[in-house]
Amino acid sequence: MGQLALQRLQPLASLPRRPPSLPPPSSATPSLPCATASRRPRFYVARAMSSHIVGYPRIGPKRELKFALESFWDGKTNVDDLQNVAANLRKSIWKHMAHAGIKYIPSNTFSYYDQMLDTTAMLGAVPSRYGWESGEIGFDVYFSMARGNASAHAMEMTKWFDTNYHYIVPELGPDVNFSYASHKAVVEFKEAKALGIDTVPVLIGPMTYLLLSKPAKGVEKSFCLLSLIDKILPVYKEVLADLKSAGARWIQFDEPILVMDLDTSQLQAFSDAYSHMESSLAGLNVLIATYFADVPAEAYKTLMSLKCVTGFGFDLVRGLETLDLIKMNFPRGKLLFAGVVDGRNIWANDLSASLKTLQTLEDIVGKEKVVVSTSCSLLHTAVDLVNEMKLDKELKSWLAFAAQKVVEVNALAKSFSGAKDEALFSSNSMRQASRRSSPRVTNAAVQQDVDAVKKSDHHRSTEVSVRLQAQQKKLNLPALPTTTIGSFPQTTDLRRIRREFKAKKISEVDYVQTIKEEYEKVIKLQEELGIDVLVHGEAERNDMVEFFGEQLSGFAFTSNGWVQSYGSRCVKPPIIYGDITRPKAMTVFWSSMAQKMTQRPMKGMLTGPVTILNWSFVRNDQPRHETCFQIALAIKDEVEDLEKAGVTVIQIDEAALREGLPLRKSEQKFYLDWAVHAFRITNSGVQDSTQIHTHMCYSNFNDIIHSIIDMDADVITIENSRSDEKLLSVFHEGVKYGAGIGPGVYDIHSPRIPSTEEIAERINKMLAVLDSKVLWVNPDCGLKTRNYSEVKSALSNMVAAAKLIRSQLNKS
């Protein structure tokens, strides 16, 4: 593996009480004063070997934060217990970076739930329904905003740009009274300083915060969020003053919104905001970090014109065109934080290739002005490869998790400054060559099949209206049919049984019997509740992607490769390292078993190719769409086998379709074309009477509704309840949707139980724009994370609401 792979995040218990000090980031020179008419700006002079990390995973190497949060929420532990776990995690992270030699170490990137929610707390922008009026925001209000409580629903949650991380969407309006209500940033800076580590506090920038917010309920949807800029900047100024008083010498503003297609007025507002903060930034070195894509030319020009900025950070993994802009114009004396180590994947960096990029930058801005960095926060990758004891040695040698990427950054910085570790670079080159030449990566037959697929189109043989008639004749469903999305609660006993079977501690016969009994319980419950189209509850599945990946070639799985999705929710993305095939049927045995337990329709449950792709760590040696088509062909075989086995309703989840949408509009059509094509490949060969469902999560679908229609599913269920029926506005505007559709009627991510009346009101809102012949009634998402008490109550109210509205329709 070489020296690089042996670097790891220290175990919490092994940390010394008094860590060695790290020289402060700006100890070499005085802080950068703001340019004024009477003073010439003095620019920070970086030493060679400068390195920087945008951000780091907060969950812990073995999900320590997840378990601490859930224990606290369940009342099993107290505030002190939770805060102690968090403090130990922060300490281990900062020390790992310090020991690795990182110069610019971030602070305030830790969060108990979400960094956007932290910013909402910092600004005191708490919606009135949570009952907060003033003072420091505590955990009760903080977690109520994230998760809801008995009397107030949670704030909306949606995808963070095109990642699988979710943020809590701020709710803003003209009457919000902003105030400095959370001192987290300065508290954590002081905490690191007490350990002898001088950090760079990180704040989400004011533009990104506002443009990722939404108008609060009751506020006109046309309300200009940027009109609040003058109201939030005073709070930012207070925070900056607080940090300076605490001894901060650097500040990092994360402004990823700059990679979006911003208009002239938005860019002007950005420029004005930072100009307005100039006096408050005096005495600080300022870094503005962008990531996830190229910075458009006009945004780049605006960024480069800012005064009082010491350095600019760019994603040079996904933002290759930004390199051309840097070549044309980069201001003299400024630092370039070059994001050459991928923060969103798990592949070991090609150190020689990255070094060439850095040398190109050296010719443009000068060696002393280049800082080696990650492309974005390492929040989006797994924590530490050292914890993977079961991965085979060859595959493991191709990988680098967050802890290893920190070492890669410093290795590049050392090499760039003339202190190249020849042994490490040689080992890295050998591992890169091993991956390129390994026979396990390429399957010629699969490559040929994909080439054939790309040359053809795939459509069902008849229109959806004709198919729905054939399906209704077979299924005989009532108006407003009820269903659930797929999963039912995963109990501790169920998880234990799966673990024991995987470890070969119980026999296959005993395992199958246990799953069968779980199916019987779930099916009986649904029949008693009166649900129309059933699911078997997915008791045999640990994860909707991992379950399929484990049965497909070209996939590998980690033991501790967890990544935060939201709050305490973590996912363990599979690794797609090679060409993909389906050796045998994956779900037919289980779906056939479940169907025999009921006379009602039973959904066969599959995960779609785009979602498997977007929720995996994907190979980076071929275009993503080619990998997606390989998965689609495997799912196609499974769909056709399910149909042959007598399964008449098949759900192909595309929960992550939209999150793969490129951030730049110019790139979106190509993605949507191949993503829709991949979905159609999976089911274009089934009979008219076989009903194809799909499900989508956490997305703003308004701008891709025509692509959703083009998917040609018979029924689509959509996560909608936290979005104030934003989706329904599409239909208000006249978009015609002839297939079945089920916008979620209640939020499964909150423990709150909606009343029958509340759900009925939602259904009536939907019927104002959707025909009762196409409307389905269902929860937002799968029920895996809820307990049975919550599920029974919520589903009972959902079915009662559907029956209530159904009876009203029959009378009219």
Curated annotation (Swiss-Prot):
Q: Which Pfam families match?
A: Meth_synt_1 (PF08267), Meth_synt_2 (PF01717)
Q: How is the cofactor bound?
A: Binds 2 Zn(2+) ions per subunit.
Tissue distribution is: Expressed in seeds.
The UniProt keywords, alphabetically, are: Amino-acid biosynthesis, Chloroplast, Metal-binding, Methionine biosynthesis, Methyltransferase, Plastid, Transferase, Transit peptide, Zinc
Task: List where Pro residues composition bias occurs.
Answer: 17-27
Give the transit peptide range. Answer: 1-33
Q: Which GO terms describe its biological process?
A: methionine biosynthetic process; methylation
Q: What is this protein called?
A: 5-methyltetrahydropteroyltriglutamate--homocysteine methyltransferase 3, chloroplastic
Taxonomic source organism: Arabidopsis thaliana (Mouse-ear cress)
